[in-house]
Swiss-Prot record:
Keyword field contains Iron-sulfur: yes
Cofactor: pyridoxal 5'-phosphate
PANTHER family: CYSTEINE DESULFURASE, CYSTEINE DESULFURYLASE FAMILY MEMBER
Organism field: Anaeromyxobacter dehalogenans (strain 2CP-C)
Classification via Gene3D superfamilies: Aspartate Aminotransferase, domain 1, Type I PLP-dependent aspartate aminotransferase-like (Major domain)
Highest taxon in the source lineage: Bacteria
EC annotation from Swiss-Prot or TrEMBL: 2.8.1.7
Compartments (UniProt record): Cytoplasm
Binding site for pyridoxal 5'-phosphate: A73, T74, N153, Q181, S201, A202, H203, T241
Protein name as catalogued: Cysteine desulfurase IscS
UniProt modified residues of type N6-(pyridoxal phosphate)lysine: K204
Active site location: C327 (cysteine persulfide intermediate)
A single BP term in Gene Ontology: [2Fe-2S] cluster assembly
Residue numbers binding [2Fe-2S] cluster: C327
Length: 404
């Protein structure tokens, strides 16, 4: 077993060796530009790009013509949310989303608010899931877009997307789904789930970083305004020379996910449960955040009461985990996702996200259980609050003295 141990699979995944092998020729011998139509180098590159497009489409039950290559899921989210809002704004300027979305969606929504759009930010239930009835109640005659993720990047909680998609479809509203954390881990089908736009990332499913895709429905056709102008690549949706090696890698990653996903999900879920039960045996006052029933296989988001998450992360340097999402864990604010779910500020501050995946082992899980057990106990020994709770004191009943 190699130290440090990687348990942050929601932030990124290692590139699968089979993916790397598929990519290598496109750096060295097959280096053509896929847009070069006049010679064999370009044709070879285009052929590889189209084969990868087929694989990504197959993974989500779409047609290859509905896959648009991007530089990653942040760009896909921006193109979907802003592109749809700008195209349909004559019909209305009201958008609906959830407070626990990824920052790429939330910040796109805030940018649109500054342009005069009105956004309804819905609160999830205590278990992290969004109630479809709330979406239905939020729709208005001028609503043009609903954007709800499939699986949350912090809690791994899976929303009832098919139901939300059906509500949007019946109301004639475009439905965007950020499916970055679910595609390749659990089934995702654009037809069964009534999805019009879906964001996909390669590096969250053992592909390379810096490449992603946006699914754009053709029947009934969904229209977007391009957010990037240039040579009109990708049917005008997204100009820019295609990253051929990255796209080939994403195609291979999609193929492997399609073939191995179900068996992998069983193995990774077993590892997650081993981790959860092990931590629960080692420690008291431990809270799992979000629904365990509706959750992606490798996610465990846990709050260790009376321990500061950042202090714990420093104490367990041998295990790579995160507090909050990788995109925002640089800020010391407690997780906005957990706060929106109604988790107290103290518990949100003490939360750790474990992400297990394809290359995680039982040995690594057992090591993490021992290490976290030891370090949490040590940090709690220094916490007067923990001592008081153990002595049966109800902290809510205490009148704290004002320090001023």
């Amino acid at each position: 077993m190699k130290i440090p141990i990687y348990m942050d699979y929601h932030a990124t995944t290692p590139v699968d060796p089979r993916v790397l092998e598929a990519m290598l020729p496109y750096f060295t011998t097959e280096y053509g530009n896929a847009a070069s139509k006049s010679h064999a180098f370009g044709w070879k590159a285009e052929e590889a790009v189209e084969a990868a497009r087929e694989e990504v489409a197959k993974l989500i039950g779409a047609s290859a013509k509905e896959i648009v290559w991007t530089s990653g899921a942040t760009e896909s989210d921006n193109l979907a949310v802003k592109g749809a809002a700008h195209f349909y704004q004559a019909k209305g300027k009201h958008l609906v989303t959830c407070k626990t979305e990824h920052k790429a969606v939330l910040d796109s929504m805030h940018a649109l608010e500054r342009q005069g759009f009105e956004v309804t930010f819905l609160e999830p239930e205590r278990d992290g899931r969004l109630d479809p009835a709330k979406v239905k109640a939020a729709l208005r005659p001028d609503t043009i877009l609903v954007s709800v993720m499939h699986a949350n990047n912090e809690t791994g909680v899976v929303h009832p997307i098919a139901e939300i998609g059906r509500i949007a479809r019946e109301a004639g509203v475009v439905f965007h789904c950020d499916a970055v954390q679910s595609i390749g881990k659990i089934p995702f089908d654009v037809e069964a789930m009534n999805v019009d736009l879906a964001s996909i990332s390669a590096h969250k499913m053992y592909g390379p970083k810096g490449v992603g895709a946006l699914y754009v429905r053709r029947k009934p056709r969904v229209r977007l305004v391009a957010e990037m102008d240039g040579g009109g690549h990708e049917r005008g949706f997204r100009s820019g020379t295609l990253n051929v090696p990255g796209i080939v890698g994403m195609g291979k990653a999609a193929e492997l996910a399609r073939l191995e996903r179900d068996a992998e999900a069983v193995r990774v879920t077993a590892l997650r449960e081993r981790l959860r039960k092990g931590l629960e045996q080692e420690l008291d006052l431990l809270t799992v955040n979000g629904s365990l029933e509706h959750r992606v296989p490798g996610n465990l988001n846990v709050s260790f009461a009376y321990v500061e998450g950042e202090a714990l992360m420093m104490a367990v340097k041998d295990v790579a985990v995160s507090s909050g999402s990788a995109c925002t864990s640089a800020s010391l604010e407690p997780s906005y996702v957990l706060r929106a779910m109604g988790v107290s500020e103290d518990l949100a501050h003490s939360s750790i996200r474990f992400g297990l995946g394809r290359f995680s082992t039982e040995e690594e899980v057992d090591y993490a259980i021992r290490l976290f057990g030891e370090k949490v106990r040590k940090l709690r020994e220094m916490s007067p609050l923990y001592e008081m709770v153990k002595d049966g004191v109800d902290l809510n009943q205490i009148e704290w003295a004002n320090p001023h």
